[in-house]
């Protein structure tokens, strides 16, 4: 029978000092011997997705203590990618994922906690905590802050739905008046919560449901809705149930590495492809798989992208649906139910929402709105927006008049009526990306599935933005932004501003954009990222010259630089002749801090999840 990890610091005469300190935190005589559950909270006033999380740890703690545990809360950092976007702050976003993972590991192992609840929400916080949870392999439940309500405003007497990207595009569009731009800005982000579309934060919170590590509704229930309170309470109760199963019954199925197996990663990727999730999810799933020692790779993603249909279309891929609409249609469980009926889901895998001995099949039987007989579940998925600006969690209890169970023309479709029979993400490869690259096909217009154009090369995102706004980029160009990968940036910046500015200039369907950086979940259009190897690691993207022809064929999963092998070999020799300046941008002026240099020293390319290169850390 496994011994409580916390016994290391609570048992024996030699631990008198440690017990004295535990007592100073409120632990009583009769508490010693109970499991100590760590609560990793990511509350911060910097981030709308986290601004309402201050008291959530106390909610979870109350449920843990009522179930017989000791709850101890700590905090992690949280970067807002939207606020960090478009300037040097974005260099810190992806590296913060590793810091979050490390900090959770440090706190949990330093204090010998027995189990963990992760309160996360936004872009790098959920992935960082996920990496830590799989690294630690102690009982864990994830519960996020939930999505924000979609913005709404009237323009030209027409009510429209909005999100963050709309504000960015409108601000850069000279045809939009100052008055309308300000109106959109003030309406785009009305409440607390993660941005309202299927951007990275919401994508990752949905994927934790599919991995089996969070409760039904975690990814889609609005941050403002009163029903979300129960998710926090149940997270506390569930982590205690998992803790007892492992430590008292020696049930290893309660551990995250046994829940998040290869099959579970396939389920998560199937969901991601079906819902057209952010391309960043590929990066984070690959990183999490490495922490779990699961051999899930880009090859698996490529294989699945050819098999799984696109069943759910959400902003930024459409203006019609946001996360509140996904929830009304049954949330993640609704999409998983359709994947199951299509024969594309493993249902024989454990799940934190299942009782001992149960699995995803039993969870779907209760929570898939197309098969459940539970009226409470149906009411749960009818939770809707109030349309009242607020930073308070659980501040409203509005409900839709009915569920969206239209699987032919609704937000979630059956396989027969899928938005497309191939999924919302694709892996492309060719001589421009030997180890692959990613495109969010859910956001690509059918007319752009094949594209050939002339390269317009930039050595940084800043130069690309200046070029787009300055009129250098014209219809038919393929904008190439390089040296923005994990090493080259360093930090692998998101390219939301370049793609937004292409749209605002009327070039959204007339140009393509290729980068060894990455894209915001808010990106749509022919935007191809994660080019691997990156420029700084000797990738072919570093050898592209202005005017080179680039051929993109998404149906064939191909991306090709139409330059002969002999010419590429000559360019590579020229690059190597630069000595210490090889594989570096010649003209870019960018301050890189010691912290970012340390990150870059160990960072791998995107095809490995941009995690640390373990080979450099082995004895």
UniProtKB/Swiss-Prot annotation:
Binding site for Mg(2+): 81, 123-124, 494
Residues with the N6-carboxylysine modification: 124
Presence of keyword Coiled coil: no
Pathway it works in: Amino-acid biosynthesis; L-isoleucine biosynthesis; L-isoleucine from 2-oxobutanoate: step 3/4; Amino-acid biosynthesis; L-valine biosynthesis; L-valine from pyruvate: step 3/4
Keyword Acetylation (UniProt): no
GO MF annotation terms: 2 iron, 2 sulfur cluster binding; dihydroxy-acid dehydratase activity; magnesium ion binding
GO-annotated cellular components: cytosol
Catalyzed reactions per annotation: (2R)-2,3-dihydroxy-3-methylbutanoate = 3-methyl-2-oxobutanoate + H2O; (2R,3R)-2,3-dihydroxy-3-methylpentanoate = (S)-3-methyl-2-oxopentanoate + H2O
Pfam family membership, one: ILV_EDD_C
Cleavable signal peptide: none
Domain of life where this protein originates: Bacteria
Keywords: 2Fe-2S, Amino-acid biosynthesis, Branched-chain amino acid biosynthesis, Iron, Iron-sulfur, Lyase, Magnesium, Metal-binding
Cofactor: how and how many bound: Binds 1 [2Fe-2S] cluster per subunit. This cluster acts as a Lewis acid cofactor.
Binding-site positions, [2Fe-2S] cluster: 122, 195
Assigned EC number: 4.2.1.9
UniProt cofactor(s): [2Fe-2S] cluster; Mg(2+)
Active-site residues (renumbered): 520 (proton acceptor)
GO biological process: isoleucine biosynthetic process; L-valine biosynthetic process
Subunit-level organization: Homodimer.
NCBIfam families: ilvD, PRK12448.1
Family per similarity comment: Belongs to the IlvD/Edd family.
Stated role: Functions in the biosynthesis of branched-chain amino acids. Catalyzes the dehydration of (2R,3R)-2,3-dihydroxy-3-methylpentanoate (2,3-dihydroxy-3-methylvalerate) into 2-oxo-3-methylpentanoate (2-oxo-3-methylvalerate) and of (2R)-2,3-dihydroxy-3-methylbutanoate (2,3-dihydroxyisovalerate) into 2-oxo-3-methylbutanoate (2-oxoisovalerate), the penultimate precursor to L-isoleucine and L-valine, respectively.
HAMAP family hit by this protein: IlvD
Protein name listed in UniProt: Dihydroxy-acid dehydratase
Organism: Shewanella sp. (strain MR-4)
């Amino acid at each position: 029978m496994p011994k409580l990890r916390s016994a290391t610091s609570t048992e024996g005469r030699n631990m008198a000092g440690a017990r004295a300190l535990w007592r100073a935190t409120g632990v009583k005589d009769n508490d010693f011997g109970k499991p100590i559950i760590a609560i990793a909270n990511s509350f911060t006033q910097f981030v709308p997705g986290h601004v309402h999380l201050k008291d959530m740890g106390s909610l979870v703690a109350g449920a843990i203590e009522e179930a017989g545990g000791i709850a101890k809360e700590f905090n992690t950092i949280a970067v807002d990618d939207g606020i960090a976007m478009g300037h040097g702050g974005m260099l810190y976003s992806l590296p913060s994922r590793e810091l979050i993972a490390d900090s959770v590991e440090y706190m949990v192992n330093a204090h010998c906690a027995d189990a963990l609840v992760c309160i996360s929400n936004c872009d790098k916080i959920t992935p960082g905590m996920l990496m830590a949870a799989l690294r630690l392999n102690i009982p864990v439940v994830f519960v996020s802050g939930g999505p924000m309500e979609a913005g709404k405003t009237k323009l030209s007497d027409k009510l429209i739905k909005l999100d963050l990207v709309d504000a960015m595009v409108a601000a850069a569009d000279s045809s939009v008046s100052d008055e309308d731009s300000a109106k959109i800005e003030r309406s785009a982000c009305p409440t607390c919560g993660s941005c309202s579309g299927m951007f990275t934060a919401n994508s990752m919170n949905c994927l934790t449901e599919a991995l089996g590590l969070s409760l039904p509704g975690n990814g889609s229930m609005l941050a403002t809705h009163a029903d979300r309170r129960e998710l926090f309470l149940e997270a506390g109760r569930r982590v205690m149930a998992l803790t007892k199963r492992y430590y008292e019954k020696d049930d290893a199925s309660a551990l995250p590495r046994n829940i998040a197996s290869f099959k579970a990663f396939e389920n998560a990727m199937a969901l991601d492809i079906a819902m057209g999730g952010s391309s960043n999810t590929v990066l984070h799933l690959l990183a999490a798989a490495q922490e779990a020692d699961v051999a899930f790779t880009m090859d698996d993603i490529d294989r699945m992208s050819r098999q799984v249909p696109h069943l759910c279309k959400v902003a930024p891929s459409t203006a019609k649906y946001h996360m509140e609409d996904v929830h009304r249609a049954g949330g993640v469980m609704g999409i998983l139910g359709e994947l199951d009926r299509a024969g594309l889901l493993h249902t024989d895998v454990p799940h934190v929402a299942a009782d001992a001995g149960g699995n995803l099949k039993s969870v779907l039987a209760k929570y898939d709105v197309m098969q459940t007989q539970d009226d409470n579940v149906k009411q749960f998925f009818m939770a809707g927006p109030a349309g009242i600006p607020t930073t308070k969690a659980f501040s409203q209890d509005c409900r839709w008049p009915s569920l969206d169970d239209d699987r032919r023309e609704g937000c979630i479709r059956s396989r027969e009526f899928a938005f497309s029979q191939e999924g919302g993400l694709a892996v492309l490869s060719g001589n421009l990306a030997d180890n692959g690259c990613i495109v969010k096909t859910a956001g690509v217009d059918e007319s752009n599935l094949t594209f050939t154009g002339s390269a317009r090369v930039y050595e940084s995102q800043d130069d690309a933005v200046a070029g787009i706004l300055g009129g250098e980029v014209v219809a038919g160009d393929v904008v190439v932004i390089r040296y923005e990968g994990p090493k080259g940036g360093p930090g692998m910046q998101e390219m939301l501003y370049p793609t937004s500015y292409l749209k605002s200039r009327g070039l959204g369907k007339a140009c393509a954009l290729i980068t060894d950086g990455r894209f915001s979940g808010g990106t749509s259009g022919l935007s191809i990222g994660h080019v691997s190897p990156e420029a700084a690691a000797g990738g072919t993207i570093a050898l592209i010259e202005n005017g080179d022809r680039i051929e993109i064929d998404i149906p064939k999963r191909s991306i090709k630089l139409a330059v002969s092998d002999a010419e590429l070999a000559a360019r590579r020799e020229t690059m190597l002749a630069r000595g210490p300046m090889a594989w570096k941008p010649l003209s870019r002026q960018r301050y890189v801090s010691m912290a970012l240099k340390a990150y870059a020293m160990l960072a791998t390319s995107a095809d490995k999840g941009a995690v640390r290169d373990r080979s450099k850390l082995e004895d």
